[in-house]
């Protein structure tokens, strides 16, 4: 019985927190809104046209209605900054999503290629980080001077062998990373 009450309290808190943190615009922003500028900002950030609904909801609390025409005009201007190959590449390189469908009036195929090249660089970078982390962990274990639990000769040999394998894998991963970066140079 007590756990049900606790669950209800946590559920109510979660709802309150989610409602309080959802406003896309503050009261002040709604009252002083330049809807074209807001559209430019949203377009430059790759937000979908439907994001205007969130602004409408936020501003309805202070009886302000968005200027849809100005917003959409601004958003189109913002999309000119967002819907470029370099930005698509960056989104992929940083491991973020990139909805090519937002860029209806742009070269979607070229944007998709740029994004995929960025994703490839991101994956190769992730591979390198993973290998580097494992190399570091092995080196720490090899250097550990724990007298209560020293490594056996067999354990040390296995770690040294794995370190050799990882060193080769790292060279190959670095080549793959460099190749992916090279192939993305002309975006």
Labelled PLM ranges:
Residues 1-22:
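Sec-dependent bacterial lipoprotein signal peptides
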Residues 22-187:
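Intrinsic-disorder/low-complexity detector
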